[in-house]
């Protein structure tokens, strides 16, 4: 049983051609057949089937189906579901069980979604390949010797492999968009504050945003509409009115659309196949009536440096709570309080997490705060000003999602700087807080997926999804 979109699934459910239980069982069986790909850290066999039966029973009794009636969804394992393990793919939280639902979980349940499992990820969302998980790497469904991207690699792989119709991820610097590009699906990071972060385990609080991974922009828009909106439990959530995304998407046309193309995104190090596919897609849109506008985004070379200074500083603070005293892993090798703190964190955290904590502690230290952290914040403001100015002249900024296609498992693990460059095109949207999306545009010479990255102005998710839909529809 396979559905290419939620609309197809919903039509079958409402027509009585299938049931929520049959659909859920089909997805769970497929997950079991793909267990060697290490996509899921937990599968909710009994809970998912029980919920599906409950939805079927209510529908048969005349109940009104919710907007996501029967939608099989996978959830990244840094989002809280009451009664389920919440590991963040880390040994330090290996046996921790969440005691509450995240706001997004509550809202999805209220619209009759079915959660089928928690997906693998880079530990505490720190990584670009899903190789930093304490529970092993995830295989890319297109080539199991290659990475699916990260940190939401499990969620992206689940959707790409047909193990979930839609999945949730979190995006700090590209962790939804980059794996979407590597797995040939749509990955949306909304405007910062569009979706409540209550119940999302924090990596870098001024960057983190829950995002959506789906096979098409229509499904992404539907789920976004359910989750979006202010939340009194998250002071950073925005009270900006939630749009009718379907209407805004329908209003988008290639005719007269102004697409900004930054020269900084097409440098010599860009993979030739990626450059060719992106330019071909832009030319295709130009032929349909869009206008390609050459733009420049000064300071782009500083994006990665500023980003890693800021997010590691925030991570060093956020992860201080994992100390072995209150919850999570506690080292047995300690005879005093200080040893408990040190040993629990040393044994519980992985290599990349410890690297980022140490870097963040360093840039926040008294002698280096002004030299690094303060300057990075100033660069962030420059980026916000430059992107705001650019989007006053164009409707969308377009470029590659990643400088290269999916790489082999283990290829970049010994070179963290090279790994960080995987996010060079996605980081700017996170720095400024604007909505961004990766949309599949074709395949390279090795038949590996390539994605295009789009950025719109604050709270223009409807326009962004509409443009993504134009691009994706033209390759189907």
Curated annotation (Swiss-Prot):
Name the chemical reaction catalysed here: L-glutamyl-tRNA(Gln) + L-glutamine + ATP + H2O = L-glutaminyl-tRNA(Gln) + L-glutamate + ADP + phosphate + H(+)
Q: What Enzyme Commission number(s) appear in the record? A: 6.3.5.7
Query: PROSITE patterns under this entry?
Result: AMIDASES (PS00571)
Q: Which UniProt keywords apply?
A: ATP-binding, Ligase, Nucleotide-binding, Protein biosynthesis
Which terms does the record give in the GO molecular function aspect?
Answer: ATP binding; glutaminyl-tRNA synthase (glutamine-hydrolyzing) activity
Q: Which Gene3D superfamilies match?
A: Amidase signature (AS) domain
The UniProt entry's sequence similarity note says: Belongs to the amidase family. GatA subfamily.
The record's note on quaternary structure and interaction partners says: Heterotrimer of A, B and C subunits.
According to UniProt, the name of this protein is: Glutamyl-tRNA(Gln) amidotransferase subunit A
- Species in which this protein is naturally found: Chlorobium phaeobacteroides (strain DSM 266 / SMG 266 / 2430)
Q: Upper lineage ranks?
A: Bacteria, Pseudomonadati, Chlorobiota, Chlorobiia, Chlorobiales
């Amino acid at each position: 049983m396979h559905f290419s979109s939620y609309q197809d699934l919903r039509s079958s459910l409402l027509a009585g051609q299938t049931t929520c239980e049959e659909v859920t069982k089909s997805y769970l069986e497929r997950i079991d057949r793909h267990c060697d790909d290490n996509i899921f850290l937990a599968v909710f066999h009994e809970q998912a089937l029980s919920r599906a039966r409950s939805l079927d029973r209510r529908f048969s009794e005349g109940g009104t189906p919710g907007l996501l009636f029967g939608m099989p969804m996978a959830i990244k394992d840094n989002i809280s579901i009451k009664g389920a393990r919440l590991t963040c793919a880390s040994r330090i939280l290996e046996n921790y069980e969440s005691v509450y639902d995240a706001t997004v979980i509550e809202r999805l349940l209220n619209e009759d979604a079915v959660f089928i499992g928690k997906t693998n990820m880079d530990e505490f969302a720190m990584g670009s390949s899903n190789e930093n998980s304490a529970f092993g790497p995830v295989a890319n469904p297109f080539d199991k010797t290659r990475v699916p991207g990260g940190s939401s690699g499990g969620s992206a792989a689940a959707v790409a492999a047909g193990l979930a119709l839609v999945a949730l991820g979190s995006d700090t610097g590209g962790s939804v968009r980059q794996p979407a590009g590597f797995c040939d699906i749509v990955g949306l990071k909304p405007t910062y504050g569009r979706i409540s972060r209550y119940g999302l385990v924090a990596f870098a609080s001024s960057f983190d945003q829950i995002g959506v991974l789906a096979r098409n922009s229509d499904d992404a828009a539907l789920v976004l509409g359910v989750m979006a909106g202010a939340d009194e439990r998250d002071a950073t959530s925005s009270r900006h009115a939630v749009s009718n995304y379907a209407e805004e998407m329908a209003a988008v046309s290639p005719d007269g659309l102004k697409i900004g193309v930054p020269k900084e995104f097409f440098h010599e190090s860009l993979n030739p196949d990626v450059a060719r596919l992106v330019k071909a897609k832009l030319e295709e849109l130009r032929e349909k009536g869009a206008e390609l506008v050459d733009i420049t985004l000064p300071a782009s070379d500083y994006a990665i440096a500023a980003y890693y200074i800021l997010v590691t500083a925030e991570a060093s603070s956020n992860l201080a709570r994992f100390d072995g005293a209150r919850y999570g892993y506690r080292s047995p090798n300690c005879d005093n309080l200080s040893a408990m703190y040190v040993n629990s964190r040393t044994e519980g955290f992985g290599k990349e997490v410890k690297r980022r904590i140490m870097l963040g502690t360093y840039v926040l230290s008294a002698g280096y705060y002004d030299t690094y952290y303060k300057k990075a914040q100033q660069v962030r403001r420059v980026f916000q000003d430059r992107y705001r100015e650019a989007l006053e002249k164009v409707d969308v900024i377009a470029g590659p999602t990643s400088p290269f296609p999916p790489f082999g498992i283990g290829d970049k693990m010994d070179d963290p700087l090279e790994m960080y460059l995987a996010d060079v095109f996605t980081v700017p949207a996170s720095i400024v807080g604007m909505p961004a999306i990766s949309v599949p545009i074709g395949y390279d010479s090795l038949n590996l997926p390539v994605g295009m990255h789009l950025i719109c102005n604050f709270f223009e998710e409807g326009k962004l999804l509409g443009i993504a839909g134009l691009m994706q529809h033209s390759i189907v």
